């Protein structure tokens, strides 16, 4: 039977490479977090615009209905 080949790396090299990989992973995580945060801000802005328009239309409709009533009261 054939044996599974194994590789032995020096501990110092392994730790150095592991530290570099951790640094790269941290950078990637921060970049992804910033991208997701920007996407969230854009979505929040769009939802805010939609709510603003809806409330504005309701406000204009209510004022259009209520203001003529004040003319009748005079």
From Swiss-Prot:
Q: Any idea which UniProt keywords this protein has?
A: Cell membrane, Membrane, Methanogenesis, Methyltransferase, One-carbon metabolism, Transferase, Translocase, Transmembrane, Transmembrane helix
Question: Pathway it acts in?
Answer: One-carbon metabolism; methanogenesis from CO(2); methyl-coenzyme M from 5,10-methylene-5,6,7,8-tetrahydromethanopterin: step 2/2
- GO MF annotation, one: tetrahydromethanopterin S-methyltransferase activity
Residue ranges annotated as transmembrane are 47-67
Q: What class of enzyme is it?
A: translocase
Q: What's the EC number here?
A: 7.2.1.4
* Location relative to the cell: Cell membrane
Q: Which GO terms describe its biological process?
A: methanogenesis, from carbon dioxide; methylation; one-carbon metabolic process
Kindly state one GO CC term assigned in the UniProt record: plasma membrane
Question: What is the reaction catalyzed?
Answer: 5-methyl-5,6,7,8-tetrahydromethanopterin + coenzyme M + 2 Na(+)(in) = 5,6,7,8-tetrahydromethanopterin + methyl-coenzyme M + 2 Na(+)(out)
How this chain sits in the membrane, per its record, is: Single-pass membrane protein
Tell me which positions the record assigns to the signal sequence: none
Q: What does the record note on quaternary structure? A: The complex is composed of 8 subunits; MtrA, MtrB, MtrC, MtrD, MtrE, MtrF, MtrG and MtrH.
Stored NCBIfam families: mtrG
Q: What does this protein do?
A: Part of a complex that catalyzes the formation of methyl-coenzyme M and tetrahydromethanopterin from coenzyme M and methyl-tetrahydromethanopterin. This is an energy-conserving, sodium-ion translocating step.
Q: Name the protein family.
A: Belongs to the MtrG family.
Q: What is this protein called?
A: Tetrahydromethanopterin S-methyltransferase subunit G
